[in-house]
Amino acid sequence: MNDKLRMVLKKRYESEIEDAKYKIQSFNENNIIIPEHIDITGEVDKLLLKIAEAEDKLAVMRLHYDQKEAKSTEYKIL
């Protein structure tokens, strides 16, 4: 994976995390209730899932594609 693509994906996942965190914070601080989304716990659960998925993707990128893909070909057999 080239550096530009890696940087764009990293920023994308980081922005997804920040967006979800901001929405959770808004629910919490402002007691926002959206008429079509009455299930606050369900909405927060969905936002937490978005955070978890984005963090997982960042972790996979770090594991397999950081350091110019040097480690992506190294697999250990247990």
Question: What residue spans do the PLM features occupy?
Answer:
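Extended, charge-rich alpha-helical interface modules
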Residues: M1-L78
